[in-house]
Amino acid sequence: MSSDTDWNSPAYTAAEAAHYHAVGWWSLTTLSDAVRRNAQRFSARDAYVDYLGAGLTWQEFDTAADALAVRLAGAGARPGDRIAVWHRDSTAIHVLFVAIERCGAIVVGIGARAGTREVAAILAASQAQLLITDEQRHAAAAGLEVATLSIDELQAAAEMGVPGPQLGPDDVFLINSTSGTTGLPKCVVHTQNRWHYFHQLAVANGELSPDDVFLPIIPTPFGFGLWTSHTTPIHLGTTAILLDRFTAAATCAAIARHRVTVLCCVSTQLTMMMADPASREFDLSSLRVVFTGGEALPYRPAAEFEELTGAKILQFYGSNETGVLSATTLDDSLERWLRTGGRIVGEMAVRLFGGEDGNTDVTETGRGQPACRGPATSLGYLNGVDHDKLFTADGWMRMGDICEIDADGYLSVTGRTSDFILRGGKNISAAQVEDAVMTHPAIAVAAAVPMRDEVFGEKVCVYVELAEVALTGAGTLELADLVEHLLALGVSKELLPERLVVIDELPRSSGGKIAKGQLRQISGHS
C-alpha cells in the first residue's frame, strides 16, 4: 500500500503482503497495464458494449482512457486525490475508472441508485476533491458541497495536463461503501491486488477464458459488481455487456442477443429471472456459468434455472469488506452447488467466533460467526471507523453472518447475526424462512423480518413479490394458502409466517440487495 498514507488497517502485515506476492496470489500488474496489454493482444475485440448500443474495442478503450486522463489532469487531478464517481453503469464509467488510476488518483465509487443524502455522506466521509456524474445525476449533484463535473463536460474540456504517476497494484485505488441495507453506508478501502486474487480464483473455479462474454448485472462500484464488471473482464481481456438497470426481460434479451456465456447476479435477480416469462421466451443456451452471491440462494429457482439453460451456478461467500471465504467450483456436486456457499478457500484462513461475548473461538464446534485473514480482504473501513466491530482483537475481519462448516469444509449460511427473529426466546433464521417460502410457485421474491408482538416479543412477517404466474391468475396469495403449502412440504412450524404482505416491489439498497431496514420500519420493528 502507499507508503505515505496511513490507512490504519490491521488486515495484513508487511510480511504477509510479501508472502502473497511471493506465492503469486498478488501481482505486479495493474488494471491500467492490463488494458494496454489488451489493446495489443485483442485490439479489435469489444471491451464493453452497453445498453445504449455504445461500445469500445480494447484499443479504443485504451485510447479513451488516456484522453480522459489528460483532461482530468487538466482539471486539477493529482496523485492521491479522491475523485468521486456517481454514474450509471455504462462503458464510460469503466473508462473513467482507468483514467483516474492513470492520474494516480483514487476512485470513490457511488452507486447509481444512491440518493443525495447517501451521496453527501460518502463525499464527506471520503473527503473527495471532485465529483464526476453522468448527465442524469448532474442536476442533483449541484447542491452537494464539492466541485462537480459531468462526464460530458470533462470529455469536452480543452485544458490538458500531464497525468500520473499511475497507481501500483498494492496502492489504494478505490473507496466504495457498504451497500447500505441498514442506515447510512461506511466507506471501504480497496487495493487492486485483493481483487486480482479474487479474479484468479474466479478464473479457476469457472474455467474462464478471454473468449467468454460477461453480463454483470450488479452495480459497478460495489464489491460483487466491481470484480465481475471491471477487474476480471479487464484482466481476462474478455467482452462485457452492460445494462443500465436490471430487469429480468432486459437481462434475458441481452443474453440471447450477445450470446453471453457468464452471467453475474445476486440471487434475488436470478430468482426474478426464473419467475419472468422472458426466461422461457429467449434463448439462454449460450450460458455456461452463473456467478451468484450476496444473499442465500433459494434451491428451487436455482435448480430450475440450471435445467432450463444448462449453465452451472457457482456461489461465492464473502462481502465487500472480506472478499471471498468460500466458493463452489464446476467439480462440485449439484447439492454442493446449490445448498452451500462452497468450500473454504485454501488461501484464506477462517475461524468461527461465538460465546456470550461473541469473541470466543468456537471453530471446533463448526458453527459461529466467521472471521478471516488472507489475500482477498480489503483494508477495512476508511479512517478505521468501526474497526473494533469489524475486526477481532487480534486482527481477523468479521462477517455479519452465522455459518456452519461441515467436516469437508463446506460452508452454509444459517442467518445474519442481526437477521434472526426472536420469537418467545427462540432464534428463528430469516434466511430459512425465506428459503421455505420461496418454494411456493406463486412467489418470486421473499423477505422475512420481525414484527412486534405483546406475547412473543416478535413474530414472523414475510413480504413477497408475486411471480408472473400468480399475477396472470388470481393476482394474490393468502397467508392460509401459503401455510398450507409449507405444512404439506413438512416445513417446521417455527418457520411458518404469521403475517404475509404482498407488494409490487421490495425495497432495495443501492447495491441491489433487499433493504430489510426499511421493511423492519414498515412492520413496526426498526
Language-model-detected regions and their locations in the chain:
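N-lobe entry segment of adenylate-forming
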Residues: 1-56, 60-75, 485, 526
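Conserved pre-ATP/AMP-binding loop-to-beta segment of ANL
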Residues: 43-44, 160-177, 184, 207-213
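Conserved AMP-binding/adenylate-forming
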Residues: 54, 69-114, 427
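Conserved AMP-binding A3 loop
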Residues: 55-59, 173-197
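AMP-binding/adenylate-forming catalytic core of the ANL superfamily
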Residues: 131, 263, 318, 368, ...
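Conserved AMP-binding/adenylation subdomain of ANL enzymes
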Residues: 196-213, 221-262, 276
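Gly/Ser/Thr-rich phosphate-binding loop
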Residues: 260-265, 274-336, 349, 356
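AMP-binding/adenylate-forming catalytic domain of the ANL superfamily
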Residues: 491-513
